Amino acid sequence: MTLEEIRNEIDAIDPKIRALLMKRFDCAYQVAEAKNRSGDLRVYRPDREDEILSRLSEEVAEEKRSGYLSVVRKIMQASRMYQYGLLYDWNEGLFEPLIRDIVIPGNASRVRVRLSRPNRPNAMSEILSMIGDYGYNMELMELISDNREEGTVTFELTILGNLNETNMKKLMFQLSMECMIFRIEAVG
Protein backbone atom coordinates (compact mmCIF):
# COMPACT_ATOMS: atom_id res chain seq x y z
CA MET A 1 0.00 0.00 0.00
CA THR A 2 1.11 3.53 -0.65
CA LEU A 3 1.16 6.15 2.07
CA GLU A 4 -1.87 7.82 0.48
CA GLU A 5 -3.80 4.52 0.45
CA ILE A 6 -2.95 3.95 4.11
CA ARG A 7 -4.12 7.46 4.99
CA ASN A 8 -7.35 6.87 3.06
CA GLU A 9 -7.91 3.70 5.09
CA ILE A 10 -7.34 5.64 8.32
CA ASP A 11 -9.76 8.32 7.10
CA ALA A 12 -12.37 5.59 6.52
CA ILE A 13 -11.85 4.18 10.03
CA ASP A 14 -12.16 7.50 11.90
CA PRO A 15 -15.94 8.00 11.33
CA LYS A 16 -16.53 4.46 12.63
CA ILE A 17 -14.57 5.28 15.77
CA ARG A 18 -16.59 8.49 16.17
CA ALA A 19 -19.88 6.57 15.86
CA LEU A 20 -18.80 4.09 18.54
CA LEU A 21 -17.62 6.88 20.82
CA MET A 22 -20.97 8.66 20.47
CA LYS A 23 -22.69 5.39 21.42
CA ARG A 24 -20.41 5.16 24.44
CA PHE A 25 -21.29 8.76 25.40
CA ASP A 26 -24.99 7.84 25.15
CA CYS A 27 -24.30 5.05 27.66
CA ALA A 28 -22.37 7.49 29.86
CA TYR A 29 -25.42 9.77 29.82
CA GLN A 30 -27.56 6.88 31.06
CA VAL A 31 -25.02 6.10 33.79
CA ALA A 32 -25.13 9.75 34.91
CA GLU A 33 -28.95 9.62 34.98
CA ALA A 34 -28.87 6.46 37.11
CA LYS A 35 -26.32 7.98 39.49
CA ASN A 36 -28.35 11.17 39.73
CA ARG A 37 -31.51 9.19 40.57
CA SER A 38 -29.66 7.20 43.24
CA GLY A 39 -28.04 10.29 44.75
CA ASP A 40 -24.58 8.70 44.46
CA LEU A 41 -22.67 11.26 42.41
CA ARG A 42 -19.36 9.35 42.46
CA VAL A 43 -18.36 8.59 38.91
CA TYR A 44 -14.68 7.75 39.35
CA ARG A 45 -14.19 4.12 40.31
CA PRO A 46 -10.47 3.32 39.95
CA ASP A 47 -11.04 -0.33 40.89
CA ARG A 48 -13.54 -0.75 38.05
CA GLU A 49 -11.31 1.12 35.60
CA ASP A 50 -8.34 -1.11 36.52
CA GLU A 51 -10.50 -4.19 35.96
CA ILE A 52 -11.65 -2.91 32.56
CA LEU A 53 -8.11 -2.02 31.48
CA SER A 54 -6.86 -5.44 32.49
CA ARG A 55 -9.66 -7.25 30.69
CA LEU A 56 -9.42 -5.17 27.52
CA SER A 57 -5.65 -5.50 27.23
CA GLU A 58 -5.59 -9.30 27.38
CA GLU A 59 -5.87 -9.82 23.62
CA VAL A 60 -3.75 -6.83 22.56
CA ALA A 61 -0.26 -7.52 21.25
CA GLU A 62 2.46 -6.49 23.69
CA GLU A 63 4.00 -3.94 21.30
CA LYS A 64 0.61 -2.17 20.94
CA ARG A 65 -0.62 -2.55 24.52
CA SER A 66 0.64 0.68 26.13
CA GLY A 67 -0.67 2.82 23.25
CA TYR A 68 -4.00 1.00 23.29
CA LEU A 69 -4.37 1.39 27.06
CA SER A 70 -3.52 5.08 26.76
CA VAL A 71 -6.44 5.54 24.34
CA VAL A 72 -8.83 3.54 26.54
CA ARG A 73 -7.81 5.55 29.63
CA LYS A 74 -8.45 8.79 27.72
CA ILE A 75 -11.89 7.54 26.67
CA MET A 76 -12.71 6.76 30.31
CA GLN A 77 -11.46 10.21 31.38
CA ALA A 78 -13.64 11.89 28.74
CA SER A 79 -16.63 9.83 29.87
CA ARG A 80 -16.11 10.88 33.49
CA MET A 81 -15.79 14.52 32.46
CA TYR A 82 -19.06 14.27 30.54
CA GLN A 83 -20.86 12.58 33.44
CA TYR A 84 -19.59 15.04 36.04
CA GLY A 85 -20.65 17.91 33.78
CA LEU A 86 -24.16 16.48 33.53
CA LEU A 87 -24.39 15.90 37.28
CA TYR A 88 -23.22 19.46 37.90
CA ASP A 89 -25.85 20.82 35.51
CA TRP A 90 -28.62 18.75 37.09
CA ASN A 91 -27.81 19.53 40.74
CA GLU A 92 -27.75 23.09 42.02
CA GLY A 93 -25.48 23.84 44.92
CA LEU A 94 -22.66 21.36 44.23
CA PHE A 95 -20.07 24.11 43.91
CA GLU A 96 -20.85 26.23 46.97
CA PRO A 97 -19.44 23.79 49.58
CA LEU A 98 -16.13 23.82 47.69
CA ILE A 99 -15.56 27.56 48.09
CA ARG A 100 -16.58 27.81 51.76
CA ASP A 101 -15.88 31.42 52.78
CA ILE A 102 -13.69 32.31 49.79
CA VAL A 103 -14.62 35.50 47.97
CA ILE A 104 -14.26 35.19 44.20
CA PRO A 105 -13.27 38.50 42.60
CA GLY A 106 -14.92 39.24 39.26
CA ASN A 107 -11.53 39.49 37.57
CA ALA A 108 -10.07 36.32 39.12
CA SER A 109 -7.47 34.79 36.84
CA ARG A 110 -6.09 31.89 38.87
CA VAL A 111 -7.16 29.31 41.43
CA ARG A 112 -4.85 27.59 43.91
CA VAL A 113 -5.98 24.14 45.04
CA ARG A 114 -4.55 21.42 47.26
CA LEU A 115 -5.33 17.81 46.46
CA SER A 116 -4.29 14.31 47.47
CA ARG A 117 -4.41 11.23 45.29
CA PRO A 118 -3.17 7.65 45.54
CA ASN A 119 0.44 7.50 44.38
CA ARG A 120 0.00 5.22 41.38
CA PRO A 121 0.82 5.45 37.68
CA ASN A 122 -1.17 8.13 35.85
CA ALA A 123 -2.60 9.61 39.07
CA MET A 124 -1.25 13.10 38.45
CA SER A 125 -1.10 12.92 34.67
CA GLU A 126 -4.89 12.38 34.74
CA ILE A 127 -5.25 15.59 36.77
CA LEU A 128 -3.08 17.54 34.34
CA SER A 129 -4.99 16.12 31.39
CA MET A 130 -8.29 16.99 33.07
CA ILE A 131 -7.23 20.61 33.56
CA GLY A 132 -6.34 20.88 29.87
CA ASP A 133 -9.52 19.11 28.76
CA TYR A 134 -11.59 21.75 30.54
CA GLY A 135 -9.64 24.40 28.62
CA TYR A 136 -7.31 25.63 31.34
CA ASN A 137 -3.55 25.73 31.91
CA MET A 138 -1.57 25.13 35.03
CA GLU A 139 0.82 27.82 36.19
CA LEU A 140 2.45 25.97 39.07
CA MET A 141 2.52 22.49 40.56
CA GLU A 142 4.25 21.82 43.86
CA LEU A 143 4.62 18.48 45.63
CA ILE A 144 3.58 19.06 49.24
CA SER A 145 3.99 15.51 50.54
CA ASP A 146 4.75 12.00 49.36
CA ASN A 147 3.35 9.72 52.05
CA ARG A 148 4.87 6.37 51.14
CA GLU A 149 3.32 4.68 54.16
CA GLU A 150 -0.21 5.57 53.02
CA GLY A 151 0.67 5.50 49.32
CA THR A 152 -0.57 9.04 48.67
CA VAL A 153 0.79 12.24 47.17
CA THR A 154 -0.40 15.76 47.95
CA PHE A 155 0.09 18.60 45.49
CA GLU A 156 -0.69 22.27 45.38
CA LEU A 157 -1.69 23.47 41.91
CA THR A 158 -2.23 26.96 40.56
CA ILE A 159 -4.63 26.82 37.63
CA LEU A 160 -4.98 29.79 35.29
CA GLY A 161 -8.64 30.64 34.86
CA ASN A 162 -11.64 32.39 36.35
CA LEU A 163 -13.56 30.56 39.06
CA ASN A 164 -16.69 32.44 37.99
CA GLU A 165 -16.75 30.41 34.75
CA THR A 166 -19.02 27.37 34.64
CA ASN A 167 -16.32 25.14 33.14
CA MET A 168 -13.92 26.03 35.97
CA LYS A 169 -16.64 25.21 38.50
CA LYS A 170 -17.20 21.86 36.77
CA LEU A 171 -13.45 21.19 36.90
CA MET A 172 -13.40 21.96 40.63
CA PHE A 173 -16.39 19.67 41.18
CA GLN A 174 -14.75 16.81 39.29
CA LEU A 175 -11.44 17.29 41.13
CA SER A 176 -13.29 17.27 44.45
CA MET A 177 -14.97 13.99 43.53
CA GLU A 178 -11.83 12.26 42.20
CA CYS A 179 -9.35 13.27 44.90
CA MET A 180 -9.06 11.87 48.39
CA ILE A 181 -8.58 15.39 49.73
CA PHE A 182 -9.48 18.52 47.79
CA ARG A 183 -9.52 22.12 48.91
CA ILE A 184 -9.61 25.45 47.12
CA GLU A 185 -6.90 27.45 48.88
CA ALA A 186 -7.08 30.85 47.19
CA VAL A 187 -8.52 32.73 44.24
CA GLY A 188 -6.77 35.69 42.69
Where are these regions (language model features)?
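A charged helix-plus-loop insertion that forms the helical arch/lid used to bind
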Residues: 40-46
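Low-complexity, intrinsically disordered terminal regions of eukaryotic RNA-associated proteins
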Residues: 17, 22, 34-38
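A conserved regulatory-domain signal marking ACT and ACT-like small-molecule sensing domains
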Residues: 88-188
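Short, charge-rich amphipathic alpha-helices with coiled-coil/heptad character
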Residues: 1-3
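Amphipathic alpha-helical coiled-coil segments
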Residues: 6, 10-13, 17-20, 27
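A general alpha-helix detector
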Residues: 5, 30-33, 51-56
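Long, charge-enriched, surface-exposed interaction segments in small proteins/subunits
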Residues: 46-88
